[in-house]
Regions:
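Short, small-residue-biased leader/transition segments that mark boundaries at the very start
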Residues: 1-3
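Alpha-helical subdomain
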Residues: 6-168
Length: 168
């Protein structure tokens, strides 16, 4: 198994300064929206089965960019899976509700998604495996309010979730 960590060049440089690349891991500097890294991976592993995990990124892209990225992944990684987290519309459209990581920062959430099946309409080669709700993971972390919210899945989806797709 090979792990590839992709991030912006300045983040990869900082990561290399702080954490040397572990054996079997590889850092790739550049934009997630570029296609060269996808083509390089496919060329290097023509028979590879890929699980692509995109964490904490897509909500900062516009919906058009997310759609384009997912189409490009489907073009190149048939048979694999793609997993990513999304903010729901309640968080994406609110000026007042922000994840803790954004408080005090100017970064903006630019897209949100409530129903994971919507992505299947954007890109028919993606088949929803799961739409997992964060409030169901690590209940102690969320406290009483989070556990209570976890009893109402529709509200949770308006906040955030983790989506997984099989690439056909």
């Amino acid at each position: 198994m090979c792990i590839r960590d992709r991030d912006l060049p300045e983040v990869i440089d900082l990561r290399r300064d702080l954490l040397p690349e572990p054996a079997g891991d590889h850092y790739i500097a550049g934009s997630l929206l570029e296609t060269q890294w996808m083509d390089d991976l496919r060329k290097k592993h023509p028979e590879g089965e890929f699980v692509i995990v995109i964490e904490g990124v897509l909500m900062y892209f516009y919906e058009k960019q997310v759609r384009q990225l997912l189409t490009r992944l489907a073009d190149r990684f048939s048979g694999g899976e793609v997993w990513f987290d999304v903010c729901g519309p309640m968080m994406a459209n609110s000026k007042y509700i922000k994840p803790d990581s954004l408080r005090g920062h100017e970064a903006q959430i630019r897209s949100g998604l409530k129903d994971g099946h919507e992505v299947e309409n954007w890109e028919p080669r993606l088949q929803l495996i799961d739409q997992a709700l964060y409030q169901r993971f690590f209940p102690k972390r969320w406290g009483f309010g989070g556990r209570l919210m976890g009893l109402f899945p529709d509200i949770c989806r308006k906040s955030s979730s983790l989506l997984g797709y099989k690439i056909k």
